[in-house]
């Protein structure tokens, strides 16, 4: 006797991967072309130099692109702290995904970010409380 195979699960349950981070940039600005929707990234940097501490960086953008995000509402959290200290949550924002195939560009503005001393500041990026990137920003 041959038993028929059970029906396959719906497509939405076949792929349950965690979101993938395709791009992470620290920059001075992002221009979105109103005609094409293309993003132009301005002034990419990877460290901050100061003459004295504490120092306050007046404005920066953390630009990121995500893919493989399941449809629905989600939360992006970004925390930062000096190596060896507890990170402070700087950002907690909602975003929405229409499909895991879509690429989602998120532009996150940070104003008056204070650095009390030089060092490597750890940055943790989470989507729905799942870490997707741990990196650092050097401040000298």
Q: Where is each model-derived feature located?
A:
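Contiguous segments within soluble domain cores/interaction surfaces
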Residues: 6-140
């Amino acid at each position: 006797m041959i038993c028929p195979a059970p029906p396959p699960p719906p497509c939405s349950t076949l792929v349950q991967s965690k979101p993938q981070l395709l791009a992470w940039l620290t920059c001075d600005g992002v221009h979105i072309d109103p005609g094409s929707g293309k993003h132009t990234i301005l002034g990419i940097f990877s460290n901050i130099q100061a003459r004295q501490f504490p120092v306050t960086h007046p404005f920066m953008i953390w630009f990121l692109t995500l893919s493989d995000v399941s449809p629905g509402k989600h939360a992006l959290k970004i925390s930062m702290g000096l190596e060896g200290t507890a990170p402070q949550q700087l950002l907690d924002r909602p975003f929405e995904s229409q499909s895991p195939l879509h690429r989602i560009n998120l532009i996150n503005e940070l104003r008056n970010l204070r650095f009390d001393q030089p060092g490597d500041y750890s940055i943790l990026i989470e989507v729905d409380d799942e870490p997707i990137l741990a990196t650092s920003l050097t401040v000298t």
